[in-house]
Swiss-Prot record:
The lineage of its organism: Eukaryota, Metazoa, Chordata, Craniata, Vertebrata. The gene is Mcrip2. Belongs to the MCRIP family. This is MAPK regulated corepressor interacting protein 2. The modification Phosphoserine is found at S61, S82. GO terms for biological process: branched-chain amino acid metabolic process; cold-induced thermogenesis; fatty acid metabolic process; gene expression; response to cold. Interacts with DDX6. Interacts with MCRIP1. One of its GO terms (molecular function) is protein-containing complex binding.
Length: 160
């Protein structure tokens, strides 16, 4: 049987996601003490420090790490950094398939529009219903984008 403690365990209480403020300040003090400017004449021109690179932290370290508390104990939703800025790549076979389907469809459209037909081969036939269904006599197609926009606006006006 499990027992439930009143407070957080030692592991949770001691767990830190970054350095303490005291550690950060002591490291900053060490870096500032050890850092003594070299006379500019001692270094060649390409090795002289610029105003942008000077600072209390070395270039390899970006400073103290920011710590964000979790909301309701849940991890924040993050997207993969590799997926954010990348563009989708297609294989050669995929591009060939797309090109084939596109060319075939354009050929069918030209033949339907009355373009030159090959006498040897059959022409495409567009389906037209000869006897329409009486239940669809009063059918009116809707624009789904417009319908969703109306639903969205209705939700907004009802909430406020």
């Amino acid at each position: 049987m499990y027992t439930i403690t009143k407070g957080p365990s030692k592991l949770v209480a001691q767990r830190r996601t970054g350095p303490t403020q005291q550690q950060v300040e002591s490291r900053l003090g060490e870096l500032l003490k050890c850092r003594q400017p070299v006379p500019p004449t001692a270094l060649p021109a390409h090795l002289q420090p610029s105003a942008q690179t000077q600072g209390p932290w070395p270039l390899a370290s970006s400073g103290p790490r920011l710590v964000f508390n979790r909301v309701n104990g849940r991890r924040p939703l993050t997207t993969s950094p590799s997926l954010e800025g990348t563009q989708e790549t297609y294989t050669v076979a995929h591009e060939e398939n797309v090109r084939f389907v596109s060319e075939a469809w354009q050929q069918v459209e030209r033949q339907l529009d009355g373009g030159p037909a090959d006498e040897s081969g059959p022409r495409p036939v567009q389906y037209v219903e000869s006897t329409p269904d009486p239940r669809l006599q009063n059918f009116v197609p809707i624009d789904l984008d417009e319908w969703w926009a109306q639903q969205f606006l209705a939700k907004i006006t009802n909430c406020s």
